[in-house]
Amino acid sequence: MLYPPINELLDKVDSRYTLVVAAAKRARQLIDGAVPKIEMPYSKKPVSIATQEIYESYVLYTSGEDETDIE
């Protein structure tokens, strides 16, 4: 079973595209040395940590015309 479930992740964002972009940007930040915002991640992989942070609302995104920014 995948965690977090994709259908529940899609409730946190407005589209699949936004989910992919936000997760990729956050994963890149983690790869570049950012500290994970969750204490006990289910995985050590950056994309898994990023999706868990989105699911648990630790990562917020703002959508503009050309970009998606994460905080």
Curated annotation (Swiss-Prot):
InterPro entries: DNA-dir_RNA_pol_omega (IPR003716), Pol_omega/Rpo6/RPB6 (IPR006110), RPB6/omega-like_sf (IPR036161). Its EC number is 2.7.7.6. GO terms for molecular function: DNA binding; DNA-directed RNA polymerase activity. GO terms for biological process: DNA-templated transcription. The RNAP catalytic core consists of 2 alpha, 1 beta, 1 beta' and 1 omega subunit. When a sigma factor is associated with the core the holoenzyme is formed, which can initiate transcription. Promotes RNA polymerase assembly. Latches the N- and C-terminal regions of the beta' subunit thereby facilitating its interaction with the beta and alpha subunits. This is DNA-directed RNA polymerase subunit omega. It comes from Alkaliphilus oremlandii (strain OhILAs). The gene is rpoZ.
